[in-house]
Amino acid sequence: MAGAIENARKEIKRISLEDHAESEYGAIYSVSGPVVIAENMIGCAMYELVKVGHDNLVGEVIRIDGDKATIQVYEETAGLTVGDPVLRTGKPLSVELGPGLMETIYDGIQRPLKAIKEESQSIYIPRGIDTPALDRTIKWQFTPGKFQVGDHISGGDIYGSVFENSLISSHKILLPPRSRGTITWIAPAGEYTLDEKILEVEFDGKKSDFTLYHTWPVRVPRPVTEKLSADYPLLTGQRVLDALFPCVQGGTTCIPGAFGCGKTVISQSLSKYSNSDAIIYVGCFAKGTNVLMADGSIECIENIEVGNKVMGKDGRPREVIKLPRGRETMYSVVQKSQHRAHKSDSSREVPELLKFTCNATHELVVRTPRSVRRLSRTIKGVEYFEVITFEMGQKKAPDGRIVELVKEVSKSYPISEGPERANELVESYRKASNKAYFEWTIEARDLSLLGSHVRKATYQTYAPILYENDHFFDYMQKSKFHLTIEGPKVLAYLLGLWIGDGLSDRATFSVDSRDTSLMERVTEYAEKLNLCAEYKDRKEPQVAKTVNLYSKVVRGNGIRNNLNTENPLWDAIVGLGFLKDGVKNIPSFLSTDNIGTRETFLAGLIDSDGYVTDEHGIKATIKTIHTSVRDGLVSLARSLGLVVSVNAEPAKVDMNGTKHKISYAIYMSGGDVLLNVLSKCAGSKKFRPAPAAAFARECRGFYFELQELKEDDYYGITLSDDSDHQFLLANQVVVHNCGERGNEMAEVLMEFPELYTEMSGTKEPIMKRTTLVANTSNMPVAAREASIYTGITLAEYFRDQGKNVSMIADSSSRWAEALREISGRLGEMPADQGFPAYLGAKLASFYERAGKAVALGSPDRTGSVSIVAAVSPAGGDFSDPVTTATLGITQVFWGLDKKLAQRKHFPSINTSVSYSKYTNVLNKFYDSNYPEFPVLRDRMKEILSNAEELEQVVQLVGKSALSDSDKITLDVATLIKEDFLQQNGYSTYDAFCPIWKTFDMMRAFISYHDEAQKAVANGANWSKLADSTGDVKHAVSSSKFFEPSRGEKEVHGEFEKLLSTMQERFAESTD
C-alpha cells in the first residue's frame, strides 16, 4: 500500500495474531460492500485507521456505537467473512509530505500508481501491495538552514531545503506543526534518503528524530499563524474570467456545467497558465546558433521545427516538442583560452573556438569541483582553525528571486579544540558524495552572484560525439573504384597525410625519409588503392621526401599522365570536400563519421605534421596555417573526447628574410583517448601502444567568460519530458533546453507552452503549480471520498512553504456521489436526491481550508490555497443539490452554458449568470496597476446586459426599429462576444492572455463604443458610419492577434496606435 495507507502499514509488518495484545483486535460483525461493521472495538477513535481481515485491508472508522465500529474500507472487500480479525493502529489516515511529491501520480489515498505498476507488472492495484508514497531509494541533496545545535525550534520552522527538480528548486524541509524542542544534532549538507535521520530534537528530556518527510492526518487542516485577506488576483489567462469574474489567490471558485461544456479545458487552462507559482526556467539562443542534429548534420536554431530531432550528449536523438521565441537581454559565452595573448599585443589573435550567445534566463549547464581546504588564522589574538568547503546553497537575486547555487561555506573554531575536529569535518565532507564535482544549472544573468573562488572553479562541458554515421563508407560504396573492405581506413589515413603536408593541386605530400615504418605504410596503403607511390628527394628540408601517388591504370611504359587521373585519393579530396576553393579543409561530416575512421584520419594527420611528447602526460601538437583546417581539426578532436586548445602564432619575417604567415598550433591531450589514436600511427616517433583496458569517452570541461550584450531576439527549443533536457550545439557544447519541467502528470504538462510575465522589470516565465490526485476507475467509493482530503492536505503543505497553490477538484460531483453511496450503506436518512443531510457541512469543511495565510514558524512566509471545483450536475441543472451547496460556500461562480458550447463559443461562460464576490477586494490591486480596470469592467457588463434586453426587442420588432444608439450597443456587444469573450486555446496568440493585454483590449472595445456613440450623438448616421469605419472595427477585432510573447511594452504601443487611429478615423468620418 502507499501514502495514506502506508503510514499505518509500515507499523504493522505483515503481522500475525500473536504479535499484538488481544485488546487491540476486534472481529468483523457484518460486511456491506466497502462498509464493514466490527465488534469488540471499545477504545477505538473516530477516523482511526484499522487493518481488516487476514489480508490487512486498510480502512477508517467513521462511526462508533457501543463496542461496534463502522469502517469504510479503501480496498476491495471481496473474501472478507464474519469473525475475521480487525486490528486497531491507533493512528489516523495520513499522507506523507516531503521531497518527491511533485514527480509522482497518486490515487485518492496517496498510492504511487507508477511505482505500483512497476512492482506488480499489472494495470490494476493488487490487494495488500506495499509501496511507499515517497520513493525511499532516491538520495536528495540536503542543505541545512540557519538552525544550529543548541537552538530552539518549533512547529513549522524551516531547518533545511532540498533541490527537488528545476520546477521546485528549493523544497523547504519543515518541522511538523505539533513538534518543538532544542536541537541536539543536525545533519551536515549532503545526500540523504527519506528514511535517514536529518534532525534530532530534545523536549522535556525526550529525544525525537526527524527525516526529510513527515506525515499529517488528511482530515485535520494544517495550522497557520494567521489567516489573511486575499488581495491578489488568480490570473487564469482567460479574458472573460480575468476581466469580468476574477478570482483571488486563496479564493474558492465553482465551475458547474453539463457534459461537453468545457469544464476540464478551463481546469487544465488554470493548471497550465495561472499565476499560482512561476518556477519554470526558459533558456534560448541567438539567431544563427548552429545546433547538431540527430543525423550529424548542422542546422541553424531558427530553422529547426517541432518534431525535428537534435543530438543528445549520449549520441542519441532528442525530439523537439516546442519552439519558444521572444526578445530579451542576451549574453555572450566565450571559452577562456589557455594561451591568452597579452592585452597590449593587438597583432596576436586568440581563437575563441567555443562560444555561443544566449538569453538572460538561459540555464548554463555547469560543473564545480567539490572543494575542501583547511586554514589557520588569528582573530583578536586567538588562533582558529577554519575549514572552507563548496556546498549547494541559496542566494537572493537583486529582483528577489531565490537562486540555487554553489557557495563557499566556512566553519571555524578555536585551535584549542585540537586539529581532530577539523580533520573530522574534512573527512565527512569527502565522504558525503562519491562525485568529484557538483553538476548544476544557473541562469546566465545569475552568474554574477557567484563568489570569486566558486566562479573561478566553475566550468561548462563539451561532449564527445558518440553518434556514428557511415558517410565515408557510403562514399566508398558508390565510388567507381572497386576497393577492398579496408578502403575507408586506407583512404582516411592517406587523406590525413595529405591535409598535413600535401600540395593543394595534386595527390602529393611530403614524409620524413628517415622514418622507414611510415614510408612502408604509405607504400602498402597506396597498393591497396591500386596506386603507385613514387618518392623524390627534396632540397629543403633534406630529410624530407615527396611522395607522388598515381594510378597504375594510366601511367607507366613511358607515359606520364596527370597525377590526378583515375586516382581514388584525389577523387576523395575533391568529392568529399577536403579541398574547397583551392584551400585545404576538414569537412564537418567527419566529426560524426565512424569513430575508427575519425581516429585513422587524425593518426595520418599526426604522422604527417604532428609532434608527440610524453612529458607530463601524453600530448600531441599539430600546426597549420589554414583556419578551415584549424576549425575542422578542433571539432574532430573534440568529437573523439580529446582536450583541445589552440595558440595563434603571428605572421613574421625570419632572419633569412622569409615571410611566415600566421599559424595555429592545436594542442591535444586526453590520456587513453589519445593513446587509441596514436596506436593507429605508423611514424616511429608518433606510435604508442593502444590502452590495455577499455575506456570511456567523457565530457570535457572548459572555463568561460560571460559578457552582457544588448536586447535581441532569441530562439529556443524544448525537448520531450522523458529526456535529460540537454543537447549539443554544433561546437559540441552541452546546453540545456528551454522550458524545463519536473512533473510527470503528462496530460497536463505535455502541452505547457513557454509563457512570460513582467516581474520586477524582467521577463519571467509563468508556470502553474498543479495539485492532481487521480482516482483509478476500479477503486472503491470510500477511497474516492478520501481523495479530496488528500489533495487539500498536499496543497496546504506547499502553502506552508510559502507557495501559492491551486487545487482543482474535477469533479466534486463524483465526490458527493461517493458520500451518497456510503451514507446509503450506513442507513442514514437521505435528503434531496438521496444525498446525505450533512452534504453542505462536508463541502464547507473542505472549502474552508482554502485561503491566504502566514505559515507557522520562521522565517516568515505567506502562501495561499485556491480551490477551483468543477461540478457536473445531471443535465446541466444548476438547482442540483451539489451545485446549490457549493454556490452557497464559494465566492466565484463561472457558469458554463451548453448552448454556447454547442455554438463552439469557448470558454462557454454565460456572462448573465456568472458572478464574482472578489471584485471589491481586488480594487487595491487594480488601483495600483490598472486604475481604469473596474470602470471598464462595469461598462463592458453594462453593454452586454443592455444588448441582452435589446435582443428580445429585436425578436419582436426587428433591428431597423431600434435607434442608432441601441444598434451600436448591439454591434459592440457582438464584437465583445466574438473577439473578447471567445479565446482560441490552441493558438499561440490566444492560448494565454496576460492581464495587461486583457486591459488594453478592454480599452480598445470600450473606446470603439464611446467614439461611435459620440459620433451618433453629433448627428452621424450609424449605418453609413459603420461602413466608413469598417477598418477600425476590423482593427479592434484583430487586436486579439497581438502576440503576448512580443512583450508588454511593444504590444501596449500597438494598442496606443490603434486608439489614436480610432479617434482620427471617427473624427474624419463625422466632419
Swiss-Prot record:
It is a peripheral membrane protein. Pfam families: ATP-synt_ab, ATP-synt_ab_N, ATP-synt_ab_Xtn, ATP-synt_VA_C, Hom_end, Hom_end_hint. GO terms for biological process: ATP metabolic process; endosomal lumen acidification; Golgi lumen acidification; intein-mediated protein splicing; intron homing; proton transmembrane transport; vacuolar acidification. Residues 494-642 form the DOD-type homing endonuclease domain. Its main location: membrane. The keyword Transferase does not apply. The modification Phosphothreonine is found at residue 131. SUPFAM superfamilies: C-terminal domain of alpha and beta subunits of F1 ATP synthase, Hedgehog/intein (Hint) domain, Homing endonucleases, N-terminal domain of alpha and beta subunits of F1 ATP synthase, P-loop containing nucleoside triphosphate hydrolases. The lineage of its organism: Eukaryota, Fungi, Dikarya, Ascomycota, Saccharomycotina. Belongs to the ATPase alpha/beta chains family. One of its GO terms (cellular component) is vacuolar proton-transporting V-type ATPase, V1 domain. ATP binds at residues 257-264. PANTHER family: H(+)-TRANSPORTING TWO-SECTOR ATPASE, V-TYPE PROTON ATPASE CATALYTIC SUBUNIT A. This is V-type proton ATPase catalytic subunit A. It catalyses: ATP + H2O + 4 H(+)(in) = ADP + phosphate + 5 H(+)(out). The modification Phosphoserine is found at residues 858, 928. Catalytic subunit of the V1 complex of vacuolar(H+)-ATPase (V-ATPase), a multisubunit enzyme composed of a peripheral complex (V1) that hydrolyzes ATP and a membrane integral complex (V0) that translocates protons. V-ATPase is responsible for acidifying and maintaining the pH of intracellular compartments. PI-SceI is an endonuclease that can cleave at a site present in a VMA1 allele that lacks the derived endonuclease segment of the open reading frame; cleavage at this site only occurs during meiosis and initiates 'homing', a genetic event that converts a VMA1 allele lacking VDE into one that contains it.
